[in-house]
Amino acid sequence: MKIYQQIGLYEYLYEMPIIQVAIDGIEADDLIGHIVHQDYYSGWQKIIVSSDKDFFQLVSDETSVYRPIQDTFISVITLLEQDKIHPNNYALARAMVGDKSDNLAGVPRIGMKTVAKLFPYLSESKQYDAD
């Protein structure tokens, strides 16, 4: 996207009922993760527009991810049906599977189906850690 397109998009979004936040030196994904967990926005329906699977760990009853290229919404139910993994445990599952776009090697020959089969409790809302 060219800079003049970004400026035009910014101006267009400014006229819409869409909250925009930008902070110098802070990556957008970190900012989005922070905002989603703020008490101020509790009770709001939040939609993250991105094709990045990293945002799946932020999905909740109040937060969904819209994937524009696939034209799909990802919700808690969608993740449970699709991957058998609850969003609270999605980061742990992705760490096992790996993610080339994030230079995360993962465990060889392990995919989401295998993770869900070996660790069925990751479908629970209780958050598990790698420890």
State where each predicted segment sits.
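Extended two-metal-dependent nuclease catalytic cores across DNA- and RNA-processing enzymes
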Residues: K2-D131
